[in-house]
């Protein structure tokens, strides 16, 4: 047991109370130099804290990120110690202080020497323990608030070198020295081929020297017979110690040349600057529509005035670095010293783990920073002028690397770190905290980057998506006559290969780091000691699993605006995936089905917990099975991870996925030979075209389906297996269609071991019951049983479409009868079940329900995406003192920072669904939209936008007379 020590806590001049201090416990017995140094630092901090803790201020409130996640990411020494209030007497001031930290998601800060000590209020796993308890971390001053803002905005740091990375500049003296060197080499060179190369390079230097000479002598140059005079540009003062300058500039846009004068009063300081091609593409990626993806810094060995002018030429509008921050963010290193991220971020504006470096030299950087350096080939416009004209310019590759690093970082932050942090309680220890993401985890080695300059085009994901993505991809696909084929992958290869999606990303220009590093990566939650490993073996496999793109120069798809990665739903991602892989919307050949066939054998997907969204990683297996197939060697049971917590958790940006079980029918259908599938599909199409078969589609997928939609899963591959839509979600959607509400009534089962029972009730009728070892398992089984019972009733009632079945089931209201296909607005819905082969009937209602249900959450996300609104689900945790509603979960929907809907439920899914329903009504009212669209409107067709429907369905809709389409 820990040795107890009491320490007094003050806030300003007021005493809050006493806390007992305990050292952190390290279960890892391996004591390398780094670990020993960390333990030494922790002991020093703890000894200083024992002298008394005086809180000077509070940190900023975390909008998305809990304080523990931020401090885990940026703290170099980890958890320093723990604090817990004494059992008695009660300390009211300390309790209020503790509750304030919990409620506002903030830390209490104590200035400790040259660092800050942050106290993080923690929940206790012991339900009877309502005493204040804290974890303590030590970080550099100011870095917490800076990194909090960056992590909330999904932003990283990027550090650029200047010379031979972004620019090449020469003065008259440097031109003369180099030309003299070429003259000596020409005199000594005997090989005619080498001689020709040297002469050509020297001529390029001479041409630029002549331009610079004209600029120095007459403030003008003659280019292609045209006289170009200088243009005066005003350089504002950077501080009170600087004076505004007026510089004479000449810009030769076609040659990427700028002539400038460092000191306008001294002509000898004139320089000719060659800008590296594709800088504009990289610069536009870093800031899209004013929203920064990276905070930009410069670290160079050049002189300061020269560096400031070079950066002004690169960023004339000051979009990358604000004018007020230039002096702090442009760091000049003296010759003989190494560059260091510690010196770049000396003012605590960023953490080295969150920074990417772009430089043409690796060895000039401190050894500990070298893993975060992406090395680019040196810019050599005189020696190799055609190098930058390659299919993939160097800076486009750098942009792709930055894109992949950012996507990978925040994918792991959202999918691995945040879910685990939400499970951490005061009783846990440092070993239970997962390793945080680090930029170095997502960079390939220098040797591997050589392949990036070719035409190899693996996928990369940048961790962002927006409505602009969908529009641009639709335009690109519709304008193109060629469609990219979907990758035909052996499922034996696809099953163990995991493709991470940082969001519902469009196919962006490539960087293999995303594909390679995560190809067979086990989940970080299951293995906290190796959460971000970078296996390199499946590189060759990964390169063949994706379709190739014609060019890498195009900008990453998600560049303009942004929907947070944590907020994208599976349907949005699925639409983007269909667009990415070039779904052929043209008329299919008569002998081919409209959609690509599934592989002959498809293993059921493992369900991996992920965030609901910033690129949430809740992919379905078809049509992009390879993206989320997880190796069978690393199964995850999300129930075990989230089971039986007595307290609600921190706000989470991922959806909790239940382990749904696929039926034997699904496995059988997946193993069906392609020819059998083709014959059956053709038969189903013919059945769908029967004269008396009139399909009906509600605003969302309803229980009343046309024969074409009930035929089988092949017609809707994107809805075949939903890894994110639980049975409770499906049942809730059915209840919405009925205008009713599903109620779950829990109880205990009399047995030797602890078991839970949950009954599902709809319209005062019991429709199902489930028993399990946990409430979640029991609820899941109850929902499945309810769907099965409803489906059985529906099938019995639908055996004869006549009116005699109108009251076959009790689940009816004035709008919908679950037992009658004719009840909805009295529209005919003829269905000839006998015309279909037995194998084509839907034998697993759970799968049918999963296919049909889209829900209010999906509708709300699509509405927000179409209107350019930013949506987020937030959870509100009850304080320990609230014993009455302790088991209830509260969810709220924030749109553009404004709460528009709230929900309460016994599960997170139930609370979130209720909040989404209320928010959907509010948003539609604010936007002036009708709450109920016309039943047959094309926009509500099948609950999906037309781009998600099979071409056969689209054409049948176009041929349908207006009386059949509109009410």
Swiss-Prot record:
Region of interest: Required for nuclear localization (NLS): 945-967
Cited InterPro entries: dsRBD_dom, Fcp1, FCP1_dom, HAD-like_sf, HAD_sf
SMART domains listed in its UniProt record: CPDc, DSRM
Keywords: Abscisic acid signaling pathway, Developmental protein, Hydrolase, Jasmonic acid signaling pathway, Metal-binding, Nonsense-mediated mRNA decay, Nucleus, Repeat, Repressor, RNA-binding, Transcription, Transcription regulation
Any one GO BP annotation for this protein: abscisic acid-activated signaling pathway
Outcome reported for the amino acid change (mutating residue 116 to K): In cpl1-3 and shi4; enhanced expression of abiotic stress-induced genes, and cold-sensitive phenotype
GO molecular function, one term: metal ion binding
Motif position, Nuclear localization signal (NLS): 38-41, 947-951
Domain FCP1 homology residue range list: 151-401
Disruption phenotype: Grows more rapidly and flower later than wild-type plants. Increased tolerance to salt stress and to ABA during seed germination but more sensitive to freezing damage at the seedling stage, by the enhanced expression of abiotic stress-induced genes. Hypersensitivity to MeJA, accumulates high levels of anthocyanin on medium containing MeJA. Confers wound hyperresponsiveness of JA-biosynthetic genes.
Domain spans labelled DRBM: 724-792, 855-925
Tissue expression as described in the entry: Expressed at very low levels in roots, leaves, stems, flowers and siliques.
Expression triggers: Slightly repressed by ABA.
Domain writeup: DRBM domains are required for interactions with target transcription factors such as ANAC019 and MYB3.
Described function: Processively dephosphorylates 'Ser-5' but not 'Ser-2' of the heptad repeats YSPTSPS in the C-terminal domain of the largest RNA polymerase II subunit (RPB1). This promotes the activity of RNA polymerase II. Together with CPL2, required for male gametes fertility. Multifunctional regulator that modulates plant growth, stress, and phytohormones responses. Negative regulator of stress gene transcription involved in abscisic acid (ABA) mediated and jasmonic acid (JA) mediated signaling pathways, NaCl, osmotic stress, wounding, and cold resistance.
Subunit field text: Interacts with FREE1, ANAC019, MYB3, MYB4 and MYB32. Binds to DMS3. Interacts with RCF3. Interacts with RS40 and RS41. Interacts with EIF4A3. Interacts with UPF3.
Protein name: RNA polymerase II C-terminal domain phosphatase-like 1
Source organism (scientific name): Arabidopsis thaliana (Mouse-ear cress)
Recorded name of the encoding gene: CPL1
């Amino acid at each position: 047991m820990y040795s107890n020590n009491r320490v007094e806590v003050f806030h300003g001049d007021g005493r809050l109370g006493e806390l007992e201090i305990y050292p952190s416990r390290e279960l890892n017995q391996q004591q390398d130099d780094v670990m020993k140094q960390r333990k030494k630092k922790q002991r020093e901090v703890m000894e200083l804290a024992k002298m008394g803790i005086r809180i000077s201020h509070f940190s900023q409130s975390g909008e998305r990120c809990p304080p523990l996640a931020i401090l885990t990411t940026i703290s170099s020494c980890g958890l320093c110690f723990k604090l817990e209030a004494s059992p008695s007497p009660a300390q009211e001031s300390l309790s209020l202080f503790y509750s304030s930290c919990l409620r506002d998601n903030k830390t209490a800060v104590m200035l400790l020497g040259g660092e800050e000590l942050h106290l993080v209020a923690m929940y206790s796993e012991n339900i009877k323990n309502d005493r204040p308890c804290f974890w303590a971390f030590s970080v550099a001053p100011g870095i917490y608030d800076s990194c909090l803002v960056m992590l909330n905005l999904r932003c990283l740091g990027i550090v650029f070198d200047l010379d031979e990375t972004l620019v090449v500049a020469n003065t008259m003296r440097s031109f003369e020295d180099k030309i003299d060197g070429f003259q000596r080499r020409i005199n000594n060179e005997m090989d005619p081929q080498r001689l020709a190369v040297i002469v050509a390079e020297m001529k390029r230097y001479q041409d630029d020297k002549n331009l610079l000479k004209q600029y120095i002598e007459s403030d003008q140059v003659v280019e292609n017979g045209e006289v170009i005079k200088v243009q005066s540009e005003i350089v504002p003062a950077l501080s009170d110690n600087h004076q505004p300058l007026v510089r004479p500039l000449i810009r030769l846009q076609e040659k990427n040349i700028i002539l400038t004068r460092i000191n306008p009063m001294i002509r000898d300081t004139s320089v000719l600057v060659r800008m590296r091609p594709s800088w504009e593409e990289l610069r536009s990626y870093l800031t899209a529509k004013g929203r920064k993806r990276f905070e930009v810094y410069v670290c160079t060995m050049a002189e300061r005035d020269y560096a400031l002018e070079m950066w002004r030429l690169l960023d004339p509008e000051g979009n990358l670095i604000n004018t007020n921050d230039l002096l702090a963010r442009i760091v000049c290193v003296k010759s003989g010293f190494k560059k260091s991220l510690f010196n770049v971020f000396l003012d605590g504006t960023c953490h080295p783990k969150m920074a990417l470096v772009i430089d043409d030299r690796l060895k000039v950087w401190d050894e500990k920073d070298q893993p975060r350096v992406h090395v680019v080939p040196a810019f050599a416009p005189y020696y190799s002028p055609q190098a930058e004209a390659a299919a993939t310019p160097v800076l486009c590759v750098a942009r792709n690397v930055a894109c992949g690093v950012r996507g990978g970082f925040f994918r792991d932050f959202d999918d691995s770190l945040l879910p685990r942090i939400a499970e951490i309680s005061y009783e846990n220890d440092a070993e239970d905290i997962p390793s945080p993401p680090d930029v170095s985890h997502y960079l390939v080695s220098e040797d591997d980057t050589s392949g990036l300059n070719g035409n190899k085009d693996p996928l990369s994901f940048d961790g962002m998506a927006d409505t602009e993505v969908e529009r641009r991809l639709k335009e690109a696909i519709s304008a193109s006559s060629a469609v990219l084929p979907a990758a035909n992958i052996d499922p034996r290869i696809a099953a163990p290969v995991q493709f991470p999606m940082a969001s519902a990303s469009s196919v962006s220009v490539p960087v293999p780091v995303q594909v390679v590093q995560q190809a067979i990566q086990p989940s970080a939650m299951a293995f906290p000691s190796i959460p971000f490993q970078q296996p390199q073996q499946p590189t060759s496999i990964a390169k063949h699993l994706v379709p190739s793109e014609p060019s890498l120069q195009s900008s990453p798809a998600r560049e303009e605006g942004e929907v947070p990665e944590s907020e994208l739903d599976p349907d949005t991602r699925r639409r983007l995936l269909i667009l990415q892989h070039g779904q052929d919307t043209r008329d299919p050949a008569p002998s081919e089905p409209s959609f690509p066939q599934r592989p002959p054998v498809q293993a059921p997907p493992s369900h991996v917990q992920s965030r609901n969204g910033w690129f949430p990683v809740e992919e379905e297996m078809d049509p992009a099975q390879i993206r989320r197939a997880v190796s069978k060697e690393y199964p995850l049971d999300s129930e075990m991870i989230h089971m039986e917590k007595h307290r609600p958790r921190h706000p989470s940006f991922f959806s909790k996925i239940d382990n749904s079980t696929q039926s034997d029918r699904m496995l059988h259908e997946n193993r069906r030979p392609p020819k059998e599938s083709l014959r059956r599909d053709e038969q189903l199409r013919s059945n769908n075209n029967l004269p008396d078969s009139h399909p009906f589609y509600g605003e969302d997928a309803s229980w009343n389906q046309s024969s074409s939609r009930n035929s089988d899963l092949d017609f809707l591959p994107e809805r075949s297996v939903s890894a994110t839509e639980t049975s409770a979600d499906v049942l809730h959607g059915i209840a919405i269609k009925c205008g009713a509400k599903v109620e779950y009534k829990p109880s205990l089962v009399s047995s030797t071991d602890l078991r839970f029972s949950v009954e599902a009730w709809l319209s005062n009728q019991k429709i199902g019951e489930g028993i399990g070892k946990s409430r979640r398992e029991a609820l899941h089984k109850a929902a499945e049983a309810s769907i099965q019972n409803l489906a059985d009733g529906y099938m019995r009632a639908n055996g004869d479409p006549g009116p005699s079945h109108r009251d076959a089931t009790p689940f009816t209201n004035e709008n919908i009868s679950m037992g009658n296909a004719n009840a909805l607005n009295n529209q005919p819905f003829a269905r000839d079940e006998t015309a279909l082969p037995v194998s084509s009937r839907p034998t697993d209602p759970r799968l049918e329900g999963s296919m049909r249900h889209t829900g209010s959450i999906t509708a709300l996300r699509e509405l927000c995406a179409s209107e350019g609104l930013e949506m987020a689900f937030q959870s509100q945790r009850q304080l320990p003192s609230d014993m009455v509603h302790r088991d209830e979960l509260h969810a709220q929907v924030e749109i553009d920072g404004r709460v528009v809907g709230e929900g309460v439920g016994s599960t997170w899914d139930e609370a979130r669904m209720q909040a989404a329903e209320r928010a959907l009504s509010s948003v539609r009212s604010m936007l002036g939209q009708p709450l109920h669209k016309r039943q047959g409107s094309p926009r509500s067709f099948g609950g999906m936008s037309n781009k998600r429907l099979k071409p056969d369905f689209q054409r049948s809709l176009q041929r349908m007379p207006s009386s059949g389409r509109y009410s």
